[in-house]
Amino acid sequence: MKLIETLKNVWKITELKDRIILTLGMLLVYRFGAQVVLPGIDASKLGALGDNTEQGLLGLLNAFTGGAFANASVFALGIMPYISASIVVQLMGIAIPYLQKLQKEGASGQKKITQITRWLTIAICMVQAPGYLVSLPSLGIPQEAFLLGQGGLFYFSSIVILVTGCIFAMWLGEKITDKGIGNGISLLIMVGIIATLPVSFVQEYAARVTESNGGLIMILIELVIWFVIILASVMLVMAVRKIAVQYARRTASGGYEKNVFGSRQYIPLKLNASGVMPIIFAQAIMFVPGLIGGMDFMKDSNVGQWLQAQFSDIFGLWYNVVFALLIIIFTYFYTAITVPTNKMADDLKRSGGFIPGIRPGTETSEYLDKIMSQITLPGSIFLALIAVFPAFIVKLMNVQQGWALFFGGTSLLIMVGVAIDTMQQVNSYLLNKHYDGLMKTGKNRKG
């Protein structure tokens, strides 16, 4: 009853209600677009494409696009080109002074960085769209499925549509972030992944019930393990280290009384401050080697065959070793960007606060940096372990690969991380309007 009361309160806040409706509408548009097949392709003859993209690297890529990749949809490229562009721009920000300057200019600089990211996204789409179209026959689409043939008109129009589809998906994500609830790009990926969950479970269930020796028991064991992994993922996302902060008591003149302190408060430093972005970034990079190795000009060479063998098997040893290392690296990198310890120290000093035993200002900033480094290491390792856990599930329990992706890994971590982030935003609206949050009673707390 408390949850129902809280959900009722959500609809009492006009701004929050409008944001939720807009978000749901945008997500529905994205899911609808994922079912719209490119003009000139017979949708009834795409069965082989779906079969060939159920497992391995292509299966994961298809999950990221919510099935659009296997549908030869107008959204077949998904939002991954935008993520790739974001990675490139942020990495270039380390070495290029102009981008470093923009990063320090606040909102105005961020607008310029966003514009650069958009243009780079278009450039990446212009490369990926022809590659996707050329690969369709090798992925199982028969020649008769191309109703107008594979001439220049088909390629030109399809490239324009695929690039436009990616730009439109990028626009949807940005609008959700600005006018809706949650991080739009992450939500688009999450709903795509969720769309593949029922099919994956049904396939695993069908495979298990045909076993004569305890198939249903194995399903129950898998579900228990799944819930445990979800719980571990939630704990990782929610875990914080509290740093005690003391505030000097204000005087009537607006200053601070010397050696007279108010109540003690805390700065919550998250164990995984970077959220799901390291997973998304690392996964975007892991798509590259296998796809390059499978291209026509590479697939017959020794290098191409090695890349395909090592990086197309997402449950293989080397794939997961590199994946885990990238997650750890990106966790440190993204934490450094998203946790501005200098600004935190300055804000603390201006408000009359300090960490007991630590001088305000530079010393406080260095102390917070030290603490973040200490907690980021175990946090990044834990994140990497959960990310590669599906490989262990496949090897130890012979789980269907599509279903195994939800036992930790990119899919589950994105779902959990994005869901919690979105709930926290809703929670903040409720608390600002003097209602208890989603995890509390849902009562109006106005005095």
Q: What would you call each of these model-derived segments?
A:
Residues 1-103, 108-447:
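N-terminal cationic and glycine-rich segments that engage phosphates or anionic surfaces
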